[in-house]
Amino acid sequence: MIAPAPGYRISAATGLHRGDRAYQQDQVELLLHPRVKGCALAVIADGMGGKSGGRKAADQVMLTAQQTFERYAPGRDDAQDTLRQMVTEAHLMIRLTAITAEEEPHSTLAAFLLNPAREVAIAHAGDSRIYHFRGPQLLSRTLDHSFVQRLIDEGRLTEEEALTHPQGNLLTGCLGTQQDPPITLATIERLEVGDALLACSDGLWHYFTPRELGAIIDGLPPRDASEMLVNKARQRARGGGDNLSLVILRLEPLG
C-alpha cells in the first residue's frame, strides 16, 4: 500500500495463473512511479503465437510499459498520449521479434495509468478488459476488439451468447499483426475513494458476471479478492482454463 495524499491510500494486488495450458503467455505488471507518489501504471498482456511467440510478445509489452512509464512525467506529459505511445512502440517491437519466432507473435493489452490528481487514463487493444467499480456497482468497462463484440454491437448476439460462441476467441485486432493495432483510449476524470479498477485477461473475465466481480472486489482486500477470483476461475474452467492475469487497484479511506 502507498499513501499518496491525506484521506486515502492506494491498495492493489496482481494475480497470474497458467491455467490448464502448457505454457504461460499472460503477463502482468503493477508499477509505481519512480519519482511521483500516487502515480501508478497497471498493464495486462495476453500473448499468442506458439509455445514461445506469445510469451515473447507479452514480455515485450511489459518491457515497453516499464520504459515508457520511466520517462513519463505527470503534469508535463499527457497520460493518454503516453499510453498510445506505449501501445504503438510495443506493437513495433513485437513485429521485430516475429523474425525469430516459429509463429507470428501477437498480444492483447489493457492498461490504466493513475495520476496523483486521481485522473485515470485507460488504453486497450484486443479482448483484455478494464472494469471500473464504485463499491460493488459497475460504472464502465472496455469493449473488446473481437468478432463476438462486433456481433453484439450489431444486435445479433447477447453478452451471454457470446460466452459460448464457437468464434468467441477471434480478435478483430491486437498487437503484433501486420495491421496497426486498434487502440481505444478513455479517461476517468476522478477516481473516488471506494472506487476500484480491475484489468484482466479473458482467462479471468470469461467466468464471471460484472455483478460477481463487483461483489468480490468490494467485499475483500485486493490480495484476497485476487486469490478468490483466480481460484473460482480455476474451478469454473473444469480443467479447460486459459492463462489468466489480473490487477486490482482500489482507493481506500484512511483509518
What are the functions of these language-model segments?
Residues 1-255:
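PP2C/PPM-type serine/threonine phosphatase catalytic domain
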